[in-house]
């Protein structure tokens, strides 16, 4: 049984988690540096935003149960996935300006998804510890040996 004072010291305060804006900017930098690698997560049926969040939590030493984030993922993917499919199928049929507007809307949906994931995270009781969030997620997707393996903490 853990000492209660140790548990209190290991607890992650809400202010220690990234704000939606900070996470959006951090994600843009990390994703932009290796977009093709991160897109492999999506190609395997995963969520890039979730993978980025799990990577960030690994960097901070904050383990999380993937099932705790599942409701947020289901809620946001229900909107994002069909929109992404519509945008891709419309690319050949719409003008460049319309396509860019669709892409901009998709980015707003991505940002919304990040916000919902972060809000869900803030509702959890989180503790510092050994964290293998990204490895666990990539393993579920069958991608633990893929191009992102060097990011696993």
Predicted regions: what is each one?
Residues 20-43:
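Short amphipathic alpha-helical segments and their helix-coil junctions
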Residues 39, 54, 87-88, 118-122:
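Amphipathic alpha-helical segments within well-ordered protein domains
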Residues 92-153:
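A charged, amphipathic interaction segment
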Residues 60-117:
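Structured binding/interaction patches within domain cores
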Residues 2-26:
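Charged, compositionally biased N-terminal leader segments and the immediate start
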Residues 35-70:
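N-terminal interaction modules that seed assembly of large macromolecular complexes
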Residues 1-7, 34, 82:
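Intrinsic low-complexity, intrinsically disordered or marginally ordered coil/linker segments
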């Amino acid at each position: 049984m853990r000492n209660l004072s140790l548990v209190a010291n290991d607890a992650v305060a809400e202010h220690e988690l990234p704000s939606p804006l900070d996470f959006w900017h951090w994600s843009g930098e990390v994703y932009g540096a290796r977009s093709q690698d991160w897109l492999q997560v999506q190609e395997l049926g995963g969520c890039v935003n979730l993978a980025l969040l799990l990577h960030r939590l690994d960097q901070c030493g904050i383990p999380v149960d993937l099932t705790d984030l599942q409701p947020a993922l289901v809620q946001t993917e229900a909107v994002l996935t069909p929109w992404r499919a519509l945008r891709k199928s419309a690319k050949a049929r719409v003008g460049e300006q319309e396509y860019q507007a669709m892409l901009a809307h998709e980015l707003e949906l991505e940002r919304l998804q990040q916000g919902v994931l972060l809000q869900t995270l803030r509702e959890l009781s989180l503790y510092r510890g050994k964290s293998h969030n990204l490895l666990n997620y990539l393993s579920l997707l069958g991608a633990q040996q893929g191009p992102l393996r060097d990011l696993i903490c």
